[in-house]
Design a protein with these regions (language model features):
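Short glycine-rich loop/turn motifs
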Residues: 31-32, 42
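Short Gly/Ser/Thr- and Asp/Glu-enriched loop/turn motifs at secondary-structure junctions
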Residues: 37-42, 78-82
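Gly-rich Lys/Arg/Thr-decorated short loops/hinges at beta-loop-alpha junctions or inter-strand turns
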Residues: 1-4
């Protein structure tokens, strides 16, 4: 599954993030494919697995996203927040910005019919919206 498709960190933090990914592989006994746009710190990660263990995938995503944020990075550098990362938006941008996002959404879309579940959500989304290629 393609679970962590779009994180980016400052170049000086990339070796730390790669170490974190290697530790995640060991901890969860998984293998990953890591690629991206190293020149701008953008990292794509895929699990090498045909199984869909949602608890495992969610744990990996939470741990990795927390590390990216801790290392002054973003979990949505190239492709936007989308459905898979919506549950992490509040942590990424902070409570104040998240509340601002909610207010804007309520003003522009009071019936929540435009892009439901994107960015503003209370549901867990990371495993529900996995890419399978």
């Amino acid at each position: 599954p393609h679970i962590i498709e779009d994180a980016a960190v400052p170049l000086v933090k990339m070796s730390k993030v790669f170490s974190v990914l290697k530790n995640i592989e060991k901890k969860y006994k998984v293998k990953t494919i890591i690629y991206g746009h190293i020149g701008n710190g953008n990292i794509h990660v895929r699990l090498i697995s045909k199984r869909k263990n949602t608890k495992l995938i969610k744990n990996i995503a939470i741990e990795y996203f927390n590390e990216v944020i801790k290392n002054e990075g973003t979990i949505s550098a190239e492709h936007g927040d989308g459905l898979a990362r919506s549950e992490f938006v509040k942590k990424q941008y902070g409570v104040t910005n998240y509340q601002t996002f909610k207010k804007i959404k309520q003003v522009l879309d009071p019936d929540f019919i435009l892009n439901p579940g994107k960015i503003i959500t209370k549901k867990s989304t990371v495993v529900k919206n996995l890419k399978k290629y």
